[in-house]
Amino acid sequence: SLEGTWLGDMHIVSYWGGVKYKVTESEITFRPYGYNSTRGDGYWVDFYSGCSWDYVAYHIKWEVYDREIIVDFIEDGYRMYISDFIINKSYFEGYIDVDRGESLKFNLRKISNPYRNWDYYDYGWGYWDSYAKGAISEDFSTVGDSTQSKTAAQTQDKPIRMVME
């Protein structure tokens, strides 16, 4: 199921102040509205290296419609389409598209499921996922308005995001 937190390369770049920055990893949390729901909300966090910020976090709403996942970014109105995807309990792959142009393949691995207390390696014993529940808060209360830095957010617009060319 899509439910849970996934980590990997989504081939995202951002432009800020005329400079292009590559996202090193994206962490996406999908929270369905109910059991077996095809809609929900969540968070999308893009991590950067070599920038004046470490990450940018966004609230998302998503829906599975006609064999694709439509992801809407609340703060900036951005929309992504995920198609031809395969999901199992530990792996999520497919193609990401923004403007109905060229799609790029992505691969993500599941790092957390907030509604379960066992891992995804079929060993069957419990664990505490300190990364997902500690370093990155599930409610993102420390992120505020989903910007990477209050100083940067107050002085400049957010980065413009797109799928790599």
For each feature predicted by the language model, list its residue ranges.
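N-terminal helix-cap/turn-to-beta initiation motif at the start of protein domains
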Residues: S1-D9
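Beta-sheet ligand-binding and adhesion/scaffold domains
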Residues: I12, Y65-E165
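N-terminal glycine/threonine-rich, aromatic-flanked beta-hairpin/loop signature
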Residues: G18-E68, K158
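Extracellular/luminal Pro/Thr/Ser-rich low-complexity repeat and linker "mucin-like" segments
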Residues: W6, K22-S26, A135
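Structural motif
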Residues: S14-W16
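Residue-level detector of conserved, well-ordered beta-strand and adjacent loop positions
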Residues: L7, R31, R109
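Small side chains
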Residues: G8, G40-G42, G94
